[in-house]
């Protein structure tokens, strides 16, 4: 968009002859220099000059020069990544520029578009649309095209005609060019196709997308990133038209699911959005979200492509994806082609945790109450800490300040979130353990809690290094000697909550037969620990495990006694009880459908379901799937064969609600994968 001529502004800045001695002659030069740098997008040079002009007492607040300086300064702040400050600056000057006449119209339109994009980035639909429509109405001819595309994509989930009208006008502009640009025509047909799909017009949407594909050269053996995205759109359209074979063909041609090792399943943080009033999502809602992964493993862009609901629902799914994260070393293994744009199918989850409560929560809560005031000087908004980099920064700041207590606490909270290399993460844990074990460093209860939490995370980190994903049941049979030894520590033994937590964390979820009696004895001591209240969550956790074990052995009267001791209803047990261990599932070659295998697809599905008291599962559905819609049904069919340990429930209710398991579909020595070809420079 062309910049605004500055004649109207400059006339207000040039001093009159009678003022020549009062005003430095460099003011006009500063303005000209700043504007010239802004025109050529050299904001590193322009911003300091605009800052100086904004502070200059000769620039009258509320004047047109002040407004122009504020808007251009704000534009530079946006370009330099300072979104909040940039938005404030633009909003402070824009009202005056809006009334300054036609000379400033292009600049006002540019500012409106910038504000619209900021609103889109924070999922503010109505504010974004208001700014974009204002910009559109200020522009004429082909200058409207880029704004029309933004409006079309923003309103794709709204229903009505706004999105389709914007796409139709954009297409008309592109077709009216003396030499129509095929790339632009492809973009407009694609936009129209997506909008139609999201309005439930699958047949019409597929027709528009097919037109885009034809203009782009058809289905070939090679695919650019643009081609891959277009083919994924057509796969979506074919699936919505119940053309499964066509969907497989287009999805295969996009390269999705044919990367070789299905790397996206290895995310360190990957949660679907919750169902319920906070998100507005219901179990029947679904979406496909396209996202990109930065070098540090964070998602730096996430946008909904398809949803069967409104903009609010579509973006609720995209917001969830925006918080996903991969370890940097895992992200580096994903080919750049797929890191730039990949898609997943999403449904909301009814799980608020990982299925079954962890016995660590009461100890964690106790530590939080003591520790959070120590952290406040380093990060007052603790609730807004969302990842390991912030905890690491707090730990390092506390270490630099010689604040050992705060450093130990920060490293304790850092440990389970740490996405650095395992050796680095373990070094941080060991350093914190050394500090926490030193006499008189922490109050006894805080020392006990940090030592137990750090030791538990240390074991989990070491086990991740063992790469034993192929036999998850094996790890469920292994106790943690380090935690069981901590339970016998003289200081921890005087702290019932800490000691019992260490025992429960240290016991195997599914002990080997030779260790079962010892595990039962440990559980009984925790279940009957009179140092804790009768219905303390730690005692309830142990009592439920004992009830389950007794029921599996046919000791139903004993199981009833332990269950009654919890004081819980069976519905409460399904939410907070220990998660049953998986005992078997048919995950052999027969579970991989041939009609999918022959295309060379590999992928994964995170399934969610309830585990019944008899170990069978019910209510199976997919919550995340890659590639979209390919493996969702096979994963659900496979999980119907899963069996878990039985659990005691007097009325046979659920043993564990909203449990989640990831099902991987892999082809050994798969030769039907895509090859990434680097463009010659």
Language model features with spans:
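Gram-negative bacterial Sec-dependent N-terminal signal peptides
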Residues: 1-19
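Charge-biased low-complexity segments
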Residues: 21-157, 161-165, 169-681
């Amino acid at each position: 968009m062309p910049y605004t001529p500055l004649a109207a502004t400059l006339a207000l800045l040039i001093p009159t002859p009678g003022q020549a001695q009062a005003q430095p002659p460099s003011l006009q030069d500063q303005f000209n220099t700043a504007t010239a740098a802004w025109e050529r997008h050299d904001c590193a040079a322009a911003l300091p000059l605009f800052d100086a002009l904004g502070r200059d007492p000769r620039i009258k607040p509320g004047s047109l020069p002040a407004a122009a300086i504020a808007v251009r300064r704000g534009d530079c702040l946006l370009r330099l990544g300072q979104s909040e400050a940039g938005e404030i600056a633009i909003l402070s000057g824009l009202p005056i520029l809006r009334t300054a006449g036609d000379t400033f119209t292009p600049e006002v339109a540019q500012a409106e578009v910038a504000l619209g994009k900021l609103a889109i980035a924070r999922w503010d639909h109505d504010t974004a649309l208001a700014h974009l429509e204002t910009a559109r109405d200020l522009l004429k001819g082909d200058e409207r095209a880029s704004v029309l595309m933004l409006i079309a994509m923003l309103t794709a989930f709204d229903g009505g005609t706004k999105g389709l009208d914007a796409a139709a006008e954009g297409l008309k502009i592109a077709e009216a060019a003396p030499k129509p640009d095929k790339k632009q025509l492809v973009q407009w047909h694609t936009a129209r196709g997506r909008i139609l799909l999201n309005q439930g017009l699958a047949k019409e949407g597929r027709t528009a997308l097919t037109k885009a594909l034809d203009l782009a050269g058809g289905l070939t053996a090679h695919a650019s990133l643009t081609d891959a995205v277009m083919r994924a759109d057509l796969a979506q359209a074919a699936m919505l038209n119940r053309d499964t074979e066509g969907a497989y063909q287009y999805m295969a041609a996009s390269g999705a699911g044919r990367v070789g090792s299905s790397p996206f399943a290895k995310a360190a943080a990957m949660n679907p959005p919750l169902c319920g009033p906070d998100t507005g999502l219901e179990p029947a809602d679904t979406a496909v979200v396209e996202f990109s992964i930065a070098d540090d493993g964070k998602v730096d862009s996430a946008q909904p492509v398809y949803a069967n609901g409104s903009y609010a629902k579509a973006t609720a799914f995209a917001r969830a994806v925006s918080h996903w994260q991969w370890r940097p070393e895992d992200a580096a293994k994903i080919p750049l082609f797929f890191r730039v744009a990949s898609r997943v199918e999403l449904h909301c989850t009814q799980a608020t945790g990982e299925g079954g409560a962890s016995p660590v929560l009461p100890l964690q809560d106790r530590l939080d109450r003591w520790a959070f005031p120590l952290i406040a000087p380093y990060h007052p908004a603790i609730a807004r800490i969302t990842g390991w980099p912030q905890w690491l920064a707090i730990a390092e700041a506390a270490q630099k300040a010689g604040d050992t207590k705060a450093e130990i606490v920060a490293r304790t909270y850092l440990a389970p979130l740490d996405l650095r290399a395992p050796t680095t993460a373990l070094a941080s844990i060991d350093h914190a353990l050394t500090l926490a074990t030193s006499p008189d460093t922490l109050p006894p209860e805080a020392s006990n809690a940090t030592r137990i939490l750090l030791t538990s995370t240390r074991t989990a980190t070491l086990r991740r290094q063992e790469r034993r994903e192929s036999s998850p049941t094996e790890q469920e049979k292994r106790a943690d000697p380090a935690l069981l030894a901590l339970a016998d520590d003289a200081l921890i033994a005087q702290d019932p909550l800490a000691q019992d937590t260490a025992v429960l964390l240290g016991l195997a979820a599914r002990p080997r037969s030779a260790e079962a009696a010892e595990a039962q004895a440990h559980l009984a001591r925790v279940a009957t620990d009179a140092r804790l209240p009768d219905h303390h969550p730690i005692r309830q956790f142990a009592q439920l495990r004992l009830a389950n074990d007794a029921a599996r052995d046919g000791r139903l009267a004993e199981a009833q006694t332990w269950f009654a001791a919890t004081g819980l209803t069976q519905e409460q047990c399904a939410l907070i009880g220990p998660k049953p261990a998986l005992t078997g599932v048919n995950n052999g070659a027969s579970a991989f459908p041939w009609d999918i295998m022959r295309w060379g697809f590999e992928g994964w599905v995170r399934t969610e379901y309830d585990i019944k008291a008899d170990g069978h599962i019910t209510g199976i559905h997919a919550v995340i799937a890659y590639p979209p819609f390919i493996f969702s049904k096979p994963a659900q069919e496979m999980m119907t064969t899963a069996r878990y340990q039985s659990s005691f429930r007097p009325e046979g209710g659920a043993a564990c609600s909203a449990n989640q398991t990831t099902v991987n579909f892999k082809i050994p020595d798969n030769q039907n994968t895509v090859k990434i070809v680097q463009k010659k420079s």
